[in-house]
Amino acid sequence: KELNWNIDLDDFDEIDDITYDFDAADIGLKEEAFAKITSLRQLQPLCDEQKWGIFCVEFDSNKFEVSALRKILSGLIPKRRNAAEHAVWSQKDLLFLCFWGTDNNRTIGIAHFEDKDTGLPQIKMISCAPAVEDFTQIRTFEDRIGHLSWVKNVTDTQAWYDQWSSAFVTAYHQVIRDSASLTVKLAAEAQAIRDRILDIYAVETHDGYVHKLFKDFKDNLIHDMTKQQFADMYAQTVVYGLFSARCMDKTQDSFNVKEAIACIPNTNPFLKRLMEECLGESSERHLTFDELEVANVVEILTHTNTDLILADFNRQTGGGREDPVIHFYEEFLTAYDKAQKVQRGVYYTPQPVVNFIVRAVDSILKTEFGLADGLASEETKTVKYMREKLKGQGMTEDTKEVPKVQILDPATGTGTFLRQTILQIYDNFRAKHKGESEEQIRKVWNEYVPKHLLPRLNGFELMMAPYAVAHMKLAMVLKDTGYDFGGDHRLNVFLTNSLEEAGKDDFQMTLFDNDPLAFESIEANQAKKNNGINVIIGNPPYSGESANKGKWIMDLMEDYKKEPGGKIKLQERNPKWLNDDYVKFIRYAQTFIEQCNAGIIAFITPNKYMENSTFRGMRWKLATLFDMIYLVYLHGNSKVV
């Protein structure tokens, strides 16, 4: 009555006279789709001009069941392929009056799908639980449903839509100008996305989107991943990926789904494809609406002045002397999950140590390998490789020209070593072009990067969140050097497990036809087979009880499980310390050096293998393989009280 809807209060005594009752079959769904639904009724049209479909949904639950509503929605909108045999509506023309909870604690919610120019429709909800909410909250609810009053001119469908949809408009009115405020908001959204993923997983079928995505990551990346770990990893990646895109955006006055995807550099095609799928911009759309409410993150970032945020980073990190991206990630993890920040401290390596290692590698390349430009060298060499014969009749040996210096960080983490490597290469490059104008240096640098930098720089990382951080960090440092990201040249930093053998190049795309992880896996396999890599740097993980026990890496480890001389099995009852992850990474790096017959390994490691008798076979192997071994003792095993 207050909203001027053409319904008499007496009509509610005979509810069947003003509504149509629906079951699962009526809208082309299976019975299990209604598992959380007590009833679904459509309010009969109140005038001939009404385009809106108004439905009443009673949930058998104490909370709003967004996944159950998704299933209803899928039966009420037009099918992409086969026409439905019942009435259908555009998503924006549907209004759901939802009820859930117990008799003493009932909640009424009104849901609408906001129409967007780009991306997935986003669910908008206003709700009220009169038994538990105070007068102010109830008054706010009443004010907002006031927008749902019946329009005077029912023939003006656009005005009708504008009025009703205005009931659901919410916005961040204040521009975010400092990193502390932004990290709190983004961390809260990441937590919400993580929880929504778990909620969806709990109610959807095995062929649902989240189930398929989770299975794909387990099959091809981390085989013992739990759904909690998956939800956590995915949520962080989405939030940090969008933040990365916003930081690369050249405009401060606008930001939307299309811009977010466009601003993800071509150097990271995996994240670009993942965001296209997540935000509904891929050619193969698999989501009906923004069920994870990722658009909330886009909205926050729309009202974020990233120029001020980045200036705030630099102020807090001594004018950029420290890594501002790591600084933000640490703040983000503190707000998101303090325990996880402690657990993930392994990703952070002190910048002075990183600087020293990268400079040392650059110096050795110049003095011992005779490469005047060090890490920036453009020199090439001829290598042998096996290729398929032209008519497919077996394999044959061939040769090709490859760069003399190719770098790999097999435990990339957040990309600290690769960032410093780029900076060192840039310093060497500028020194070589000393005396030229800034315009000329920038021009030649933009020619150098896709031809001589990106193809030589490689990184492997197992966890998706630091992987996204690494790509953001490296894109930003390239941007700072003046690189304009022309072309489709990617950064060879891949989401993969270094300690697993390279698979076949004809990787079967298991999730969707345009599966981002499938493309990433194919390219990671090709990078793993690169027999030209000869500089391996980084800070591999330390884990006495390593989970990396695949046959391929364990077979390689047999090299270190022999007595000096390499013929007799190591006479140790329990050589378990040889199975530490960092030892496996040293052995992994050794394979590249053996393939090239020359190279450098520069790792930060524990010092056990230098003295402990269990490692005598490993020490002998390294001493016979390498001409020079430099050990810098940092007293990392000392305890500071």
Can you say where each PLM-predicted feature lies in the sequence?
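SAM-dependent methyltransferase catalytic region
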Residues: 316, 320, 334-631
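Short, solvent-exposed secondary-structure capping/transition elements
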Residues: 67, 105-107, 229-230, 247-260, ...
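Short, basic/polar, glycine-containing "phosphate-handling" surface segments that engage DNA
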Residues: 1-229, 233, 299-330, 564-573
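Long recognition/docking surfaces used for binding and targeting
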Residues: 248-337
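Non-catalytic, well-ordered alpha-helical scaffold segments
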Residues: 94, 184, 191, 211, ...
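Short, hydrophobic/amphipathic alpha-helical patches that form generic packing surfaces
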Residues: 236-250, 330-331, 472-479
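Class I S-adenosyl-L-methionine
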Residues: 629-641
